[in-house]
């Protein structure tokens, strides 16, 4: 299991995000066994985020937007919650001028992995429930 950590200050400026590529992101649920999956740790990067009841998405869709491009998943991040006015549908438009970090999961299609997840909120909830995402 690998934990990929982003800290406040790692991000780029709004509209010119820092871009990180992750290869071989293990998609198994994290914490289930010694060969559990990898984890994205954004708790120090995101400012003012909250998780909803029962590991719900809370306001995290204001911070995270997901897009599938070929066989990759692009995680667009606004560390200050700048996506609040967006539609929050996977692959829909988002406020690129607010993006400060982009995480590319190479060879991973999260929408296919979590079949039926068509909104950012649904993907976030799946990631939280599978211990794949750490936030405050």
Q: Could you tell me what each predicted segment is?
A:
Residues 1-60:
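Acidic, glycine-rich calcium-binding repeat modules characteristic of RTX/beta-roll
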Residues 61-136:
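Low-complexity acidic/polar repeat-biased segments
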């Amino acid at each position: 299991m690998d934990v990929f950590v982003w800290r406040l200050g790692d991000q780029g400026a709004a509209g010119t995000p820092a871009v990180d590529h992750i290869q071989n992101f293990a998609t198994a649920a994290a914490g289930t066994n010694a060969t559990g999956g990898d984890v994205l740790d954004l708790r120090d990067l995101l400012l003012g985020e909250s998780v909803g009841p029962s590991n719900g998405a809370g306001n995290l869709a204001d911070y995270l937007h997901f897009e599938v491009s070929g066989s990759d998943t692009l995680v667009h991040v606004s560390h200050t919650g700048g996506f609040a006015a967006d539609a929050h549908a996977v692959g829909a438009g988002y406020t690129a001028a607010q993006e400060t970090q982009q995480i590319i999961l190479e060879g991973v299609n999260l929408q296919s992995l979590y079949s039926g997840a068509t909104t950012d909120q649904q993907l976030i909830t799946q990631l939280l429930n599978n211990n794949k995402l750490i936030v405050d």
